Amino acid sequence: MTSVQSATCCCLLWLVLCVQLVTPDSPATAQLSRHLTARVPVGPALAYACSVMCAKGYDTVVCTCTRRRGVVSSSI
C-alpha cells in the first residue's frame, strides 16, 4: 500500500469513527455533553461545515442545528 493510500485509509477511518461518536441515533456510541462545546468560538470553516451537516440532517456535538429530529423509542 502506498503512502497516499495509507493516508487516505487513515483519514476515512478517522471520519467514520468521528461520525459514529456524534451520531445520536447510532446504538452503543459515545455521547459527549453539548455544554462543553458551547464555549468554543465558531470559525468560518466550521460554520460552513455545520451548515452542510445540518442541511443533511446530521446534528453533531460540535454543530447545534436548530431543527432537531424527534426521538423514536421502541418497546419490545
From Swiss-Prot:
One of its GO terms (molecular function) is acetylcholine receptor inhibitor activity. One of its GO terms (cellular component) is extracellular region. Residues 1-24 form the signal peptide. Disulfide bonds join 50-63, 54-65. It comes from the Eukaryota. Residues 25-39, 71-76 form a propeptide. It is found in: Secreted. Belongs to the conotoxin J superfamily. Highly inhibits both nicotinic acetylcholine receptors (neuronal (alpha-3/beta-4) and muscular (alpha-1/beta-1/epsilon/delta) subtypes) and the voltage-gated potassium channel Kv1.6/KCNA6 subtype. This is Conotoxin Bu28. It comes from Conus bullatus. The lineage of its organism: Eukaryota, Metazoa, Spiralia, Lophotrochozoa, Mollusca.
